[in-house]
């Protein structure tokens, strides 16, 4: 059975990717700040993780390593976007967007690389 890890799964595209992957008989690992939407679906392993928090990411990877998880597909779907015009966007909002969309995605990928099968895909 192939394993897929998807970030940003509490709603929208990430949520639907998990549901579709489960229907295709993948082992599904969901990573999201809010894991509640998928927690009660049998066959989906949910992790509540803020990808901007390096300690939480390290704990996630250590847990997956302890369970001897090998990842075949990594889908970096987590993202942050505020519906604001450029001139109204605060520094904090820009920073949060980059922390999630750039640094968080890079860090989760970097930390998960040892668990991704040689034939795996990011």
Predicted segments with their positions:
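N-terminal Rossmann NAD(P)H-binding glycine-rich loop of SDR-like oxidoreductase domains
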Residues: 10, 18
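The beta1-alpha1 cofactor-binding region of Rossmann-like NAD(H)/NADP(H)-dependent oxidoreductases
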Residues: 49-59, 91
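A short, exposed helix-loop element centered on a Lys and neighboring polar residues
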Residues: 109-110
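A hydrophobic alpha-helix adjacent to the NAD(P)-binding/active-site core of NAD(P)-dependent oxidoreductases
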Residues: 46, 89, 97-98
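Conserved glycine-rich Rossmann-like NAD(P)H-binding loop of the short-chain dehydrogenase/reductase
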Residues: 24-38
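Substrate-binding pocket helix/loop in short-chain dehydrogenase/reductase
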Residues: 85-86, 93-95
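Conserved NAD(P)H cofactor-binding loop of Rossmann-fold oxidoreductase domains
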Residues: 77-82
């Amino acid at each position: 059975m192939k394993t897929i890890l998807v970030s940003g799964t509490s709603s929208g595209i990430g949520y639907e990717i998990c549901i579709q992957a489960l229907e295709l008989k993948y082992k599904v690992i969901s990573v999201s700040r809010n894991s509640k939407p998928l927690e009660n679906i049998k066959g989906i392993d949910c992790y509540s993780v803020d990808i901007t928090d390096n300690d939480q990411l390290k704990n996630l990877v250590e847990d997956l390593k302890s369970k001897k998880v090998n990842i075949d597909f990594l889908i970096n779907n987590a993202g942050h976007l505020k519906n604001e015009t450029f001139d109204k966007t605060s520094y904090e909002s820009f920073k949060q967007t980059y922390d999630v969309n750039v640094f968080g995605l890079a860090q989760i990928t970097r930390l998960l690389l040892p668990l991704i099968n040689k034939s795996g895909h990011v």
